[in-house]
Amino acid sequence: MTREARTAVARRAATARWVRKRFGSPNFETLGFPGGDLVDTGLCDLADGKVTVESLLVSLAASRLRREGVPLSTVHADPEDRLCGLLSRSSGDLAHARYGAYLRQVSSFADACRRTRLDRRHRAP
């Protein structure tokens, strides 16, 4: 196994441990968070160094996701332009609509993380 592959495996495992510890589930999708499937896929793709719609979306929302406590080690450079380009190639005239829909999903995901974080804080002794 190459060094990069070992690093990717370690990043995925660390993310799963963090999500399990914080939310009691190994991933966001099973928690039912809106956009959780996109964020799960994006985190795995980032760990693997893949440039996908999901990894670019997570990179684009990195500052908000980090503020809500989502562990992000590395992100893609210039994610907004790269995501627009990728969507333009795959969706043509629908690229702008899909871009907006993806942003709304990741924003809803971050809102759900925030609500969960605040709920846990208020329940703590």
Which residues are covered by each model-predicted region?
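Basic DNA-binding region of bZIP-type proteins
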Residues: M1-V19
